[in-house]
Amino acid sequence: MSEYQVAYLPIGVPTFHLESAQAGFEKSVRLLTSLSTHVVCPQKMLLTIEELNTFLDMICPQLLIIQNITFANAAYASQIRHRFSCPTLLWTLREPVIDGGRLRLNSLTGAYSAANAMRALGDDRFAYVFGAPEEEAVIHKIHAFLRAGEVYHKLHSLKMAAVGHTPQGFGFGRALDSELLHTFGVTLESIETRELMEKAVSYTEEECADCRKAAEQAMTGLENTPAKNRDAFVRLYKAYDDYVKANGIGALSSRCWPDFFTAYGTPVCSVLAMLNDNLIASACESDVYGALSMYIGTQLTGLPTFFGDPVSLDEAENTITYWHCGTAACSLARADTGAQVGVHPNRKIGPTMEFGCRPAEQATVFRVGRKPDGTFRLLILPGRALDKPKQFCGTSVVVQPKADALRVVESSVKAGWEPHFTVIYGDVKDELLALADMLRLEAEVYE
């Protein structure tokens, strides 16, 4: 895959107030290069079609920022769209002075001209921002667009793995490799759980030493797990870790029950927790789209995400509790407990993770969902993660959404959303909305 590149295209004509335009150009370059190291900028404003084409010959962008540095007619945008079809942000500069004198830039009319041409050429999902480079709202929107664009680019080189098949009745997480590739640019490969189990039992104790040390450092109370299960867990962790590294896997979904209890004798929960701490997005119950949701969240924040079921609603507190059996990344544990180790709540076999997740003033509940007609949509729920202890056996996080929690539950149940969600540590609503546009997906925001 080609190197990620964002191209800044300041288009205009030389008949407007060039001192004002030059000031806007210089401020824009400073802003864009401060927000991303991947932005390429021309040495000067592109004030003729010839200058535009010369610069277009020099670039190979995955993302475009078209700015009307002054008014420019539709030929500029048409030429750009003829050459490149990548996601685009159209940026209008605010008029610098309104004093009854000369119209300095006329950038807004240029935006209408560009947008009209882009729509006519089939591009109806470009992003748009209005304002000067120093305005906070403009900075925020451009930054969100750039971050979403980087994730969009990474998705097109992502290789996911489906380890085993979904259990009976969990088909919502089963993915077709062709659909993932077509919609997200993601490659999906499959491997049976049996293969990793067989690999796990083949290791020597010395070969597992590094994985054992990493687990002991991350977990609290692993030594209390029976030696047989502790050893089996470390071996399984090494098998997954080796497979991920050998095959360039960036995210995976894994079958868990009943196989790892009945055929292997030890759960995979804590293995997935360790992988999540290594920023390999890992979902249980073979939920490929859950793992994809986690991957997107991790790429936006650089942090592990929480994966779980919505299990409890408290109308008085306006909260929704998300829980799962024990796969949360150890680094998400509350500071006062650490990443405690326990046993699976149903099977009574360990090790699994046992803790409440740490609080966060900003959090986003997120899901890549597949509709019955085969199209995809995104659920986005901004809120915060409260300072709450473990709610049930396993791992949990209590989210207080900005929206009414009861309305969120009622609406999302009636809308047929899947029963697994990702809790992202951070407010990434705008980035997810920008990504939805880039992927041409429906986004449902609850706020």
Curated annotation (Swiss-Prot):
The protein's Enzyme Commission number: 5.3.1.31
UniProt catalytic activity: 6-sulfo-beta-D-quinovose = 6-deoxy-6-sulfo-D-fructose
GO BP annotations, alphabetical order: monosaccharide metabolic process
Record family assignment: Belongs to the SqvD family.
The keyword Transport appears for this protein: no
Ranges annotated as spanning the membrane: none
Keyword Phosphoprotein in record: no
Species annotation: Clostridium sp. (strain MSTE9)
A GO term, aspect molecular function: L-fucose isomerase activity
InterPro entries: Fucose_isomerase_N/cen_sf
Keyword terms, alphabetized: Carbohydrate metabolism, Isomerase
GO cellular component: cytoplasm
Task performed by this protein: Part of the sulfo-TK pathway, a D-sulfoquinovose degradation pathway that produces 2-hydroxyethane-1-sulfonate (isethionate). Catalyzes the isomerization of sulfoquinovose (SQ) to 6-deoxy-6-sulfo-D-fructose (SF).
Name of this protein: Sulfoquinovose isomerase
